[in-house]
């Protein structure tokens, strides 16, 4: 399933990172990350947070720089850099159980 407000943004970020890491490991150029949803949903208790998110201006996406020649299995957080990353203040929303 796809929790549009909380889950999908995390999935996009993590799988986009994985796309870059796999391309690097295989010696390939990074292609595109395509995400499809099954059972996409928005929880009613997220509506205020969603309206806040939609009222904000977008920023240009940052660039990912992988600062190592290590294998995908040895890379850690310190080997990664986001260039020109900008963000708005966090929006809190409850996780559905």
Curated annotation (Swiss-Prot):
Q: Main subcellular localization, coarse class?
A: cytoplasm
State whether keyword Oxidoreductase applies. no
Q: Name the positions where (6R)-5,10-methylene-5,6,7,8-tetrahydrofolate binds.
A: 3, 96
Q: Which residues bind dUMP?
A: 1-3, 11, 41-43
A GO MF label: thymidylate synthase activity
InterPro entries, A to Z: Thymidate_synth/dCMP_Mease, Thymidate_synth/dCMP_Mease_dom, Thymidate_synth/dCMP_Mease_sf, Thymidylate_synthase
Subunit-level organization: Homodimer.
Name of protein:
Thymidylate synthase
Q: Which organism is it from?
A: Staphylococcus epidermidis
Give the encoding gene's name: thyA
């Amino acid at each position: 399933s796809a929790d549009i407000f909380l889950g999908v943004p995390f999935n996009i970020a993590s799988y986009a990172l994985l796309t870059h890491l796999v391309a690097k490991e295989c010696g390939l150029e990074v292609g595109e990350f395509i995400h499809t949803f099954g059972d996409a949903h928005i929880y009613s208790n997220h509506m205020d947070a969603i309206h806040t998110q939609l009222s904000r201006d977008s920023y240009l996406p940052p660039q990912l720089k992988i600062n190592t020649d290590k294998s995908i299995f040895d890379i850690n957080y310190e080997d990664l850099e986001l260039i020109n990353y900008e963000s708005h203040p966090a929006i809190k929303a409850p996780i559905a159980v």
